[in-house]
Amino acid sequence: MPFPDFDPVLVQLGPLAIRWYALAYVAGILLGWRYAVAMVKNPRLWTHRPPPVTTEQVDDFILWVTLAIIVGGRLGHVLFYTPQIIWTDPLQILQIWNGGMSFHGGAIGVFLAIILFAMRNKVDLWRLGDLVAAVVPIGLFFGRVANFINGELWGRPTDAPWGVVFCNERIRETLGWCPAGEVARHPSQLYEAALEGIVLFLILRWATHGAKLLNRRGVVMGLFTTFYAVFRISLENVRQPDAGLENLPLGLTMGIYLSIPMLLFGLWLIWRGMREETPPALAPADKPA
């Protein structure tokens, strides 16, 4: 099927262009923020431990997360996928508006932000990580949909009836050619939006609201890390490898290599958290109002 004639720019205000990709980041951060606040306020989620942070601390942490996503995502993309620009065109590192963000880099940035915020505010590192992990799929969903609208990070060629030809007149006029060619490809961005966004959100929603796993330190973060890695590794088989990284050792992609440590870390977090003894149930007066 032909690629829809999406305009990556939502609104053009003189020299200022508001892009769908930027809007996806804003929507993911704002909705994730409100969801985190709602979780902190929900006493049914904190039956054995009080929330790790107050709603005011969640508000403060949003700035940390936003900076961590942008800086970590951009540096991760440069280091993992385009390290050559460090020497050939270092100013390009700052050109975020031209695209190029890495989930794995953003994840490292957010984890460092969690560590620093926890140390500064004397809150439990693993439990803050659990709260953050529960909301991340919201941002992943919007980000992958924006990738599709931008016509980037497409999949491998396919004969499936839902294959998309990522080429149209707008792409030709903007770039002068169609980088994806004129063959039908897997819409891998939408696969990722479904698995890393919707399915992963539902898994973590069950973990937090159904199984009450916020009472076990690090388990929700472990579930997020494990399932994200499993989904990403699986979908790398239908996602087109990044240019210049098609011939990595063992035939694996950069996404797989970066996800394997996540998988191991996630399994360790789950194992560690499930072995830890759960404290006694909180008295009603100790639960969040």
From Swiss-Prot:
<comment type="pathway">
    <text>Protein modification; lipoprotein biosynthesis (diacylglyceryl transfer).</text>
</comment>
<keyword id="KW-0808">Transferase</keyword>
<dbReference type="GO" id="GO:0042158">
    <property type="term" value="P:lipoprotein biosynthetic process"/>
</dbReference>
<feature type="transmembrane region" description="Helical">
    <location>
        <begin position="13"/>
        <end position="33"/>
    </location>
</feature>
<protein>
    <recommendedName>
        <fullName>Phosphatidylglycerol--prolipoprotein diacylglyceryl transferase</fullName>
        <ecNumber>2.5.1.145</ecNumber>
    </recommendedName>
</protein>
<keyword id="KW-1003">Cell membrane</keyword>
<comment type="similarity">
    <text>Belongs to the Lgt family.</text>
</comment>
<dbReference type="InterPro" id="IPR001640">
    <property type="entry name" value="Lgt"/>
</dbReference>
<keyword id="KW-1133">Transmembrane helix</keyword>
<keyword id="KW-0997">Cell inner membrane</keyword>
<keyword id="KW-0472">Membrane</keyword>
<feature type="transmembrane region" description="Helical">
    <location>
        <begin position="218"/>
        <end position="238"/>
    </location>
</feature>
<dbReference type="Pfam" id="PF01790">
    <property type="entry name" value="LGT"/>
</dbReference>
<keyword id="KW-0812">Transmembrane</keyword>
<comment type="function">
    <text>Catalyzes the transfer of the diacylglyceryl group from phosphatidylglycerol to the sulfhydryl group of the N-terminal cysteine of a prolipoprotein, the first step in the formation of mature lipoproteins.</text>
</comment>
<feature type="transmembrane region" description="Helical">
    <location>
        <begin position="99"/>
        <end position="119"/>
    </location>
</feature>
<feature type="transmembrane region" description="Helical">
    <location>
        <begin position="250"/>
        <end position="270"/>
    </location>
</feature>
<dbReference type="GO" id="GO:0005886">
    <property type="term" value="C:plasma membrane"/>
</dbReference>
<dbReference type="GO" id="GO:0008961">
    <property type="term" value="F:phosphatidylglycerol-prolipoprotein diacylglyceryl transferase activity"/>
</dbReference>
<feature type="transmembrane region" description="Helical">
    <location>
        <begin position="61"/>
        <end position="81"/>
    </location>
</feature>
<feature type="binding site">
    <location>
        <position position="144"/>
    </location>
    <ligand>
        <name>a 1,2-diacyl-sn-glycero-3-phospho-(1'-sn-glycerol)</name>
    </ligand>
</feature>
